[in-house]
Amino acid sequence: MKKILFTFISSVLLFSNSVFSMTLWTTETQPGRMQIQEELIARFTAKTGIEVKLVPQEEDELIEKASAAFAANSLPDVIFNAACVNFCAWAYDEGVFDSDAATEIVNSLGIDTYSAKGVLSMSEVEPGVYASVPSGAWPNATYYRMSYYNDNGLATPTNYANILAGAKALHNPPNRYGAIVPTDVAAGFMSQWMETFAIANGLHPVKEDGSINFDQKKTIEMLETYKALVGMSPEGIHHWQNGRDFYASDVVPLTFWASYLLDDIAGTRDNVPIMVDDNPQSLALAQDTNVIVGMAGPSNPDGGTWVEVHNFGVTVDANTDEAAAFIEYVMNEEYVTWLGMAPEGSFPIRPGPSAGSNIFIDEWGNLPIGVDRKIPINQIYSAEIIESLINGLAVGTRWGAKEGQLPVAAKLVNSGLMNRLMMEYINGDRSAEE
């Protein structure tokens, strides 16, 4: 029925004497990604007659640009944001997004076609009401060397206890350190991982009324675990690059990174040589790596992880029929093409166009990843790892998402307060209770 309805709408739009046009703002601004979008739009126009104006917008300017356009009643029809958790919450609160239009699209696509229900719920502003249309996601993950863990009889680092036990067993400085975690208090990378470790232990300080309250037991468990990992990290201040490079150079067997590390450790970047054998472009490291999406703490055995979500938002100034036709076209016929702009950072959250179908996941696995060299995902990682990556999104969330207080959570995270308190605790300037 959905397909028939979409075909009917497309036919009406195609054969009408009117000239249709819509505007799409996109944060996928890199030249290669712009080309992919332009080519996709050309195919959409050929099929429907709807002409789409593609306008690149930088993520860090999007709120300012959308605010100005909203005030001038000149919003685009659709806004695509590859980092939409906080922006989408803002856009809904400010009346920029049309939740009725987004909800109709989500229902048309089929809620039962979304496998990552947690990711979908992050766009749900009221029961059954969606601020925007989730299209993909990328998670934080734990990366570890399977050979080191297997050879030493170590348990898979899926929880605080196993993570600490493995890191301690393999910690042998200066030749090898047990792990590496970010310690650069000014960097968003540390903020992401502080939130990740907190979510893993069920620590959600932002409450439904917008207040902030840190559960003492859960907070202390998180602080003690993170401090122990800092003690088993190489010396120095660590940010995203250290976490990648020390792992690629065989200095640490355990690192915590976003899914964007998937191609970096596969020898596809000239500036990230793989140093586990004599070949800097070797696949040996990636193929000896297991990737776990989701981590559990002692107070939260079900675990969780930090996740970023990509969304299409229909604005209040939109021609909703055209906007819906475009979004549904992308989410069905061109879904894998859209994810292919950056597959390692765009996991499919719809396995297929109908419940029970896995065609989108299968096709996503065929997508090439890399920078200086490209290799299909499924030629680097096993089917089991790919499946676990996708399934891991089920525990993805963010502070304030469940409580409907994402803007409050964003202010807390962006303040860097947790980062500073953590380092004061690590340096002995503050007790865990404080």
Identify what each model region corresponds to:
Residues 83-139, 164, 190, 278-295, ...:
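Hinge/lid segment of periplasmic solute-binding proteins
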